[in-house]
Regions:
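N-terminal non-catalytic structural scaffold regions of very large proteins
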Residues: 2-286
């Protein structure tokens, strides 16, 4: 690269894309946009960001391992510098998304579309919810305590999990529960089509009972995003399979690639985050 090149006239492609996605997000904050369209913009922003981490961030991660001295032709940044800049730009976008979602949720509450907190339900509502949990959710849960009998499992890409920090006789363990994919995520109250509880909130509320003889020190809803940086035309993936079979194999491989992002809901997860970052070999800022 020419050392006299003025990089102020060009911009890193990934940072430019994040600015574009921010404009998508800000559409959700416009009062003149119908409320369900605002929810749609929030969904588009989130889906865009998922794909960005899977493909673009995944690719830069790979580049940082193979060619750590490579410099981007538009910004003169190394892969590590690009990842640092992406992290700096993404964090405020998450905060903005949460702020906008909180506003939209408040407006939905005025229309009686309410995400109920289990702690605030009446005794009768809790009784019905407990019955639903025991009949429909509990039978399909597969809780695991990581240890000699259960080594650290493969955590699927973009599937919500409940992570728990467990304590038994001063020994700390890690537990995990995958959210069942076949169940509806929004559970509406009978006879009331607008008040609902999320599936993960129900499991999070009752999951202590699944770990007998343990005390639950921390618990949180989490999600892992894995790199999807596979080129189906690369020679190492060539085969004699028909194209459909070949692409199915590629999709399966994408599901097992390196984690590039670790997301949590809420704030009570400091030790869980530290443990998973170590086990998944991922920076705590990712």
């Amino acid at each position: 690269m020419n050392k006299h090149y003025d990089f102020s006239y060009t911009q890193d492609r990934e940072l430019s894309w994040l600015k574009f996605n921010e404009r998508v997000l800000r559409e959700a904050d416009k009062k003149n946009v119908p409320i369900f369209e605002r929810l749609k913009f929030l969904e588009i922003f989130t889906n865009n960001l998922d794909e960005f981490f899977m493909v673009r961030v995944g690719s830069i991660h790979e580049m940082s391992l193979i060619h750590d001295d490579h410099r981007d032709i538009r910004s003169d940044l190394t892969p590590e510098e690009q990842l640092d800049e992406i992290a700096k730009h993404v964090r405020p976008l998450y905060e903005l998304r949460d702020q906008i979602f909180a506003k939209v949720s408040k407006e939905l509450e005025q229309k009686n579309i309410i995400r109920s907190k289990i702690e605030e339900l009446t005794k009768e509502e809790k009784k019905k919810l407990r019955s639903y949990y025991e009949a429909m959710i509990l039978p399909v849960l597969s809780p695991i305590v990581i240890g000699k009998q259960h080594p650290f499992p493969h955590i699927p890409n973009k599937v919500l999990q409940i992570g728990l920090l467990l304590k038994k006789k001063e020994k700390i363990s890690f537990g995990i529960i995958g959210l069942p994919r076949d169940l509806e995520r929004m559970i509406f109250f009978p006879g009331d089509g607008r008040r609902y509880v999320l599936l993960e909130d129900i499991i999070l509320y009752y999951c202590d009972d699944l770990f007998e003889n343990y005390s639950v020190e921390e618990k949180a809803v989490l999600c892992i995003t894995r790199s999807a940086d596979i080129n189906p035309d690369d020679e190492i993936y060539e085969s004699t399979d028909d194209y459909r079979t070949h692409m199915k194999k590629i999709i399966k491989m994408r599901a097992r690639l390196k984690p590039v992002r670790l997301e949590f809901e809420g704030n009570d997860h400091k030790q869980i985050k530290k443990y998973l970052s170590m086990r998944l070999n991922i920076s705590e800022q990712d």
